Each structure stands twice: as structure tokens, then as C-alpha cells.
Amino acid sequence: KACTTLMARLKIMANLDIAEKRLPQDGRIVYKQFNRKGIDVDLRVSTAPLNHGEGAVMRLLDKQKSTLPLTALGFSDQNLEMYRDLIKRPYGMILHCGPTGSGKSMTLYSALNEINDPGKCIRTAEDPIEYTLKGLLQMQMHRQIGLTFAAALRSFLRQDPDIILVGEIRDQETAQIAVEAALTGHMLFSTLHTNDAPGTISRLTEMEIEPFMISASLTCICAQRLLRRVCKTCGTVTEAEGREDEILQRAIDWSGPIPHAKEGGCPACRGIGYKGRVGIHELMPISEELVKGINGEYDTAKLKRIAVRNRMKTL
């Protein structure tokens, strides 16, 4: 009885349908000015029907980290310079791919902050809205009433924004409209669940998007992951031995001492040896050679070889 009451209260707070117990639901709870610093606390709520009743998971979003600069996200110098140039283009499509929790949303928000100015109209379609940013017009999806990513995109195209963010491309309809938006003078940002950058091309093809439309609309694809950061308080460094220096230099453009986590850690990292996370990125700008490969319907392995020849650093 207590669980049923608690679940009903949680659904009300997250603006979910308390009568719907057969389908998964996603919502959001916001506590305004939760602490003395006036920081808002944002919770993403997900419910699902399970064999012994409904289950709920709440994900705490760090509002203080909503405006991290691109320089703090772990981009290499080469990738950072390239990415900054790509996001400032007037039209095209930039896709971020990776599993859930790989930092895609954070990178997208940071990119929008980088290019945001009063002279640009930026619209976002999100499910749910993770962070509220100044200067952006953000739309919360409500699939129960038919407000989907595809419906939001159609609406945006009639309102002539400069930049569009779509939380995720989930189906063929959304993918088709996203491509059309990129081809009609808009810069579109979105995400896909694929393992690496070249694999995104295959995913779009599976969604029945014509190869020539993919190559014409895509600006770049960025695959990413989050790795644990060695604790700065107790971490140690060692010099590269043997061919380690050569291998690291060639693979990830790294030279110098190699950081190591201390076994047992320290109080600062709670005995783990790691504190915080840092992103790694696989940036694949669409070159003329890749355009030919996409139009020629090359497989993922061949597209990856072309991208590596064009100086893409793989994950």
C-alpha cells in the first residue's frame, strides 16, 4: 500500500499519468532554489511496469554543470578547433552518437552555448528538457497528446529558426524531417544510439534515408564516451617505457608522463583512485571522399578506413 501511494505521488510530481500502469513513462521534477545558493535541483523520472508492480528510477541532473565550456569536455586540441568551426556553419546536420550516459546531451548544450547570441533563433525539442538555458526556446515532448519529435520539427520549420536541436532521432519520420531541415538552410543538432561515428551512416540507411540525402545534409558525426578521471590528489605518474611513447603518440596524440590511479585511493576520491569523468571523442567531418563513399553505399568498415585516412582519431 505504501509503495502504491508513493508511486502515485511521484507520478503527480513528475506530471505523469497516475492511472497508466501498463506502459513506461518519463517525466521531470524541478525543485526551484533548493539550497542556499539558489541552485535548482532537477530530477528525471522514469517508471516501468515490472513483474511485482511498477518500478521507478530517478536521475539527478547537476544544474551547476549545464554550461560547461567546450574546452572542459575533453576534446583534443585538433578536435576542438575542428568542432568549433563545424558548429558555426549556417546549415547542415551534426549528430552525436554513443550509449546512454556518454555525455551527448552535455556536449550539445555546450555547443549551443558556444554559438548562442541574441541575433540567432534557437529552438529545441527535448524529452524531457534536461537543462533550461537562457536565449533558447525549448519544447517539452508529450507523446500522450501527439507532441513527438517529428511533430515538433514540422512546427519549427514553419517558424524559420536558425538552429534546431532534436533530443534524439528515434524513427524514420523524425530522421526524414531532420535531413530536410538541414537541406533547407537550418543547422540541426541531434543524437543517435550507435557505437561509433561511421556506424551512424548505416543506422540512417536502415531508417530508409537515401544515401545522397545523408551525404548532402551531414556536416559531421561525433561519437563519444565518458571515462573516469584519475584523482588529482593521490594519482601518480610514470614515464613511458619502450614503445609506449610511440604508440600513444600515434594513436591518441599523447606525449609525456602517464597518469595512474593509486590503489586504495585517498579521502578526496573516497578510496576509489578516480574522481570525476572526462570525455573522449571520435570526430568524423564529412569530407568529399566520405561523400563519395556514402553515395556509393560503402559498408561501415570501408567508411571508417576513409575517415581514418582523413585524420579521424577513433575511440
Locate each region found by the language model:
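Short, flexible helix-loop junctions that flank or precede catalytic/ligand sites
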Residues: 1-315
